[in-house]
């Protein structure tokens, strides 16, 4: 039986890419019975009479799975945040990073619209960028008006499945249009009333760019820490994870425990204050979450 990867799911059809091309398939009823929904990114077994009539027979085990957006087997996330319009938002970036780290997906931070910033804003954004690089993250500066700045992203996309995510209105679709001009993905200007863009992407689709596949997702419609527990959170902050091994108490939450290495690192300036503040904010949010039964 042939195998392939689902690159688009739309109106009950699954578009499976394989060695011979792309075949439009439906899911077998057994999937509904077993409460399995094939996802974009799934590696599958299928059978087909022709390119327009096929059936997905089996879904292979996933290495990870996102719910919103619904996509599986993601290698890395390109997190696009603008320097201005809307202004750079480290709190929202950290929220994305936690969600991505929790799913064992490699994050790459891409800061767009650097051509629009004044000098004070440039210095502030570059300072944040240096902080994130010290934490071990790749940080790229891009502008859709300077195509060569987008080109630096291409090597990161090779031989892997990437999701492009980030704040609405920061230029995700514009960036993909530069990488693949034939796409002509819809873009929206920023609403001056809201200071943010409207989502312009309506379904998840994997797009070929070089030897890689990139998902232009409809954005993360939920940024809540639904599945994350307090004890997971430390491991989603690389610099906290590094210091936490020196805490006196195993399972230290780095809030009120004595001889906490994380708090000591914050006081000594080895962990950025804003990162620790975001960590505390997220702990509070998780603790206030209504229990699920």
Swiss-Prot record:
Pfam families: RsgA_GTPase, RsgA_N. GO terms for molecular function: GTP binding; GTPase activity; metal ion binding; rRNA binding. It is found in: Cytoplasm. Its EC number is 3.6.1.-. Residues 63-223 form the CP-type G domain. GO terms for biological process: ribosomal small subunit biogenesis. GTP binds at residues 112-115, 166-174. Monomer. Associates with 30S ribosomal subunit, binds 16S rRNA. This is Small ribosomal subunit biogenesis GTPase RsgA.
């Amino acid at each position: 039986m042939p195998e392939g990867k689902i690159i688009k799911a739309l109106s009950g059809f699954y578009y499976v890419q394989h060695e011979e091309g792309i075949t439009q398939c439906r899911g077998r009823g057994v999937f509904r019975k077993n409460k399995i929904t094939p996802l974009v990114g799934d590696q599958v077994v299928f059978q087909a009479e022709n390119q327009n009539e096929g059936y997905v027979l089996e879904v292979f085990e996933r290495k990870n799975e996102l719910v919103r957006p619904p996509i599986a087997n993601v290698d890395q996330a390109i997190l696009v945040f603008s320097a201005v319009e809307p202004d750079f938002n480290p709190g929202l970036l950290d929220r994305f990073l936690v969600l991505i780290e929790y799913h064992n997906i490699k994050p790459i931070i891409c800061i767009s619209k650097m051509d629009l910033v004044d000098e004070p804003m440039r210095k502030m954004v570059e300072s944040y960028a240096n902080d994130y690089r010290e934490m071990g993250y790749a940080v790229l500066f891009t502008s859709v008006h300077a195509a060569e700045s987008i080109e630096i992203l291409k090597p990161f996309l090779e031989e892997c499945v990437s999701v492009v995510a980030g704040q609405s209105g920061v230029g995700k679709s514009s960036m993909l249009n530069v990488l693949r001009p034939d796409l002509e993905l819809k873009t929206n200007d920023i609403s001056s009333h809201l200071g943010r863009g409207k989502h312009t992407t309506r379904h998840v689709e994997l797009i070929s760019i070089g030897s890689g596949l990139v998902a232009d997702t409809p954005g993360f419609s939920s940024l809540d820490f639904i599945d994350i527990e307090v004890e997971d959170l430390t491991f989603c902050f690389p610099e906290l994870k590094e210091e936490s091994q020196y805490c006196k108490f195993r399972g230290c939450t780095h809030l009120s425990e004595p001889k906490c290495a994380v708090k000591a690192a914050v006081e000594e300036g080895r962990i950025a204050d804003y990162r620790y503040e975001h960590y505390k904010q997220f702990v509070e949010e998780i603790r206030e979450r209504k229990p699920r039964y």
